[in-house]
Amino acid sequence: GSDYLSSDPDFLIYQPVALGHHRSYDGTRGYPLSFDNTASPYRDAIDLIHICDCLDAATDYLSRNYHRAKPFDVVLNELKAGRGTEYNPDMVDVLLSDRELYNDLKMLTEQNRENIYYDIYLTFVNLRKKRQ
C-alpha cells in the first residue's frame, strides 16, 4: 500500500498512514520496525486505520481464507483488552461508549459486506475513469 501511494502525487500524503498502520499503539510491536508511529504527525490517523484494519480483518467472512471470521462483539472485547498497548485508548473508549457507532459497525461487519465492497470498487473505478 505504501509503495502504491508514494507513486501517485494525489495520495502521497497518505503514505505514512499506510506505512504505520501495522504498528501497535505503544510502538512496541508490528512492522516496519524502522517506522516510529508514536512520533508521527499522523499518529491519530495511523491509530484509526490500525483499528479499522484489525476490525475488518477479524470480521471478514469473504476474503480471509486463513481464518474464520469473528463476531463483532468478540473483536470489540479484543480491542478493549488491547486498549492502551495495541490500540489507541481514546478510540477504543469511543467504540465502547457510542451506541450508534457500535450499531453501525456491527451492521457493517456482520451484514451486507458484499455490497459494501462492490460499492467501494465502483467508486474507485469511476474515480480512475475521471482521471484518464
Sequence positions of predicted segments:
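Histidine- and acidic-residue-rich, metal-dependent catalytic cores
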Residues: 1-132
